[in-house]
Amino acid sequence: MDFLNEIASKWQKVWDSERVYEADVDRTKEKKFITVAFPYTNSPLHIGHGRTYITADIYARYLRMKGYNVLFPFAFQFTGTPILSIADAVKRGDEEIISTFTNVYQIPIGVISKFSDPSYLSAYFKEDMRNTALTLGLSIDRRREFTTIDPAFERFVQWQYKRLQEIGYIKKEKAPVAYCPVDEFPVGMHDTRGDIEPEIIDLDVIYFQGEKLLFLTATSRPETIFGAVAILINPDSDYSIVVDNKNGKRLVMSTEAFKKLSFQMSLTEEERKKGGELIGLNVTNPVTLKKLTVLPSKYVESKQGTGVVMAVPAHEPLHYLALSELKESFEIVPVIKSEDYGDFPAMEVLETAQTTSAQELKDYIDTLYRIEFHKGSIRDEVVDLVPDYMKQFVGERIAGKSVREARSSVVELLRNLGVHGNIYEIINGPVYCRCGAEVVVKVFDDQWFIDYSNSTWKSSVLKSLDKIEILPQDAKREISKIIFNMKPRPFTRSRGLGVRLPWDDRQIIDSLSDSTIYTVFYIVANKVKSYPTSILNERFWDYVVLGRGDSSQLSRELGIPKEQLEELRMEVEYWYPVDSRHSGRDLVQNHIPYYLYHHVGVLGEDKVPKRIVLNGFIRVGGKKMSKSFGNVYPLNKAIREYGVDTVRLALTSTSSLSDDIEFSPNIAKSIGEQLKHIHDFIENLIKLQSVNEIRKVDLWISSLISEYIDLIDNCLSNLDLRTAYKTIYYDIYEDLKDYLELGNGKINSDIIKNVISVWIRLMAPFTPHLAEELWHKLDNSLVVRQRFPSKGELQYDKRALLEIEYLRYTIDLINSMKSKMSKEPETVIIYVNEDNTQRDLIRKAIESLKERKSLPDFEKEVGDREMARLAYEIAGDLPDKIKNLAEIGINESEILTSNAQFLLNKLDVKEIYIYNSKDPSTPDIKGKKSIALPYKPGIILT
């Protein structure tokens, strides 16, 4: 909306010129350090970014108003494959990427062509993001801005990794790693399309010797080798005959497997054949020494494993189907027994499932595997299947043992026979790199790893979680589990933008690994930029960040004035640790645990963040926002269409923190219209005729808004933005409309000025631009520099609050009844009960509820079970405002009678009759007179 964006632009310029968000050390104030996960500069900010950044900004603004010295900085991630893959895609003319930039983000094609240069791409989007952050009204201290390729930041990260290496948390070893064959470096979740973390498993490989060739079979169940009766391959797929350069063996595997396994083994392809050309060849089962035939099967997927399968029809339904479809007899050799299945589990599964679809059988097969592994044991008869020289080993180590125990012994047997190996597979594949290539597993001989499996380190990180408040609370368990299961992680790349590994400048530290303790760098970023990088050595950072060393000696060594060094150290001591770390919930899988590990490892357990806030996703069109769904919504577009403050509310406050938020045009338009209504309403309200006396209705509105202050204060403290949003932008608006109606269109200007002052300040964290515009109708100061409201600012009268709230409660009861009627009523009859004995009983019931007493306990206390139950029911249904004020006596008849016109207007009826149910002369219509109770009038609608 133009109106909202115009006032936003106006006040942003004022705030910028006044430098209201710059934060420096102030020992007279308690500090709060708020940070968000910084963005990759590979495309414009979208509304998903907006949710996280605005949530943090609302919290930062709230804390400033509470009197804290708040630092909220921002920076830009230039490192990693997200940027490199976009640059490469533009370079090769990727139509999808180019179309997204032109059609979704409205970037000129002449600019897009320059994105093939990663440095230009990053710099362009850095400026775009900076401008968007300003447009969004983020209250950031822009002096502390940096990028991850700034020279000073590079020295900071290099210092961090030298520290980790010295402690022993960095290691170099041979290991399997998810790898992009095109970009030629390891990949993780942030490097893949859809942000999928490649999950690597190892598979056992068994060699089946043929006359001239070895058929390489991959399996997750090597113990079933005793029941292997054939070799299965896909006749329509390509198969490669390859030489293992390590031992000269000639192996058969699918061509797709050869391409993948070439990254794990040294292989040379000799020949390529169709699978059908290999059908009929014979091989030997290395354990039973039986001759097996190579047979065709459509169920064999050449992409999985080696594309060669040992057929075990007793325990694998798909193998049984494959052999059955050949219309020839075949042997079935059971190997595993369990109480859940008979002698031939595969046949039982097929009979139960009543399908031959591999997809439909998957869950049944998974269940069979799981039960046989956890509950099964190897049959004693397997001893009879092996030659004499194996019988002792099989009899003692395998036969009769649980499958869990026997599996390792079978592997040992196969290794002793020289027919066992291992390969690695991405179990959740196919996973694609951002460049479009399918991710494979590569075995590195000299890959650098961060040893997240180190037991001492891991234990300290888990312990540190006790010091951290995590919102939502259920995320702490998830984070604990992820930390507990963490393994060594490769953290370097061979190309791209980023920080060079200090002891191997051929390697670049990846984007998840250079963004771990970078929040410390914010504190000194604005000052160290001016220093020559040569003096930003380990001793500099040891002193500034850790307080190690002597400032006088360091000053002489580095040529930096001692006072400057001590000031830098003092700033770190003042601001750190982070008080609230904000990110999307997706970063629980990687960034958040890495962030904690590195804080504990480098800075110590006492420097972990005090709070971690994880928000849900944004959905567009009912789906999680994703490029693959074509529903990416640029933040700038949303702001242009709906207005800054509308977007701030729509992206943060229409759902609870952990839930996803649906961003839709209808919701955004509705919010924008409500903001305009509020603006116009306040503008008109302060112009209305004032009365001199303070009326009951004036005391009511003042008291009611006073009650809201604590509610909203608590909501903002705990980031319950939805409740605060509803209260500020809808409840208070409706309350003030009722105030005008109850006050016959007149106001008490002193009361209302104070009420509006509070209302505007309650808006300020959420919609700062609208709040600033409205504030200047009352005052010439800046609302962003005002204190958060306190209850003491407004007059408070319990009786006035209770009486009007009782009136509104009665209206709610009647409207609830109206909603269930097929015809609109014209007349309302209300019976009120003024019996003090019954009123006292309901008060007692309210107290019992507050004390969490049970109904049986209350019944014993009262003695009269029926009356106790009624009182308890009424007390439970009362709004909190009435419960909290119930100790005050009120005259229900007088309240309703004196506000009869208001009732008529609000209920839209022609007549209203109010009776005292205890008056003998009162007519009893439809028996409602006798059932009226205090706080629960008898109501008839006709």
Curated annotation (Swiss-Prot):
Keyword Isomerase attributed: no
Matches recorded under InterPro entries: aa-tRNA-synth_Ia, Leu-tRNA-lgase_arc, Leu-tRNA-synth_Ia_arc/euk, M/V/L/I-tRNA-synth_anticd-bd, Rossmann-like_a/b/a_fold, tRNAsynth_Ia_anticodon-bd, Val/Leu/Ile-tRNA-synth_edit
Extent of motif 'KMSKS' region: 624-628
A single MF term (Gene Ontology): aminoacyl-tRNA deacylase activity
Renumbered ranges of motif 'HIGH' region: 39-49
GO cellular component terms attached to this protein's record: cytoplasm
Stored PANTHER family: LEUCINE--TRNA LIGASE, CYTOPLASMIC, LEUCYL-TRNA SYNTHETASE
Name of this protein: Leucine--tRNA ligase 1
Organism: Sulfolobus acidocaldarius (strain ATCC 33909 / DSM 639 / JCM 8929 / NBRC 15157 / NCIMB 11770)
Taxonomic lineage from the root: Archaea, Thermoproteota, Thermoprotei, Sulfolobales, Sulfolobaceae
Gene: leuS1
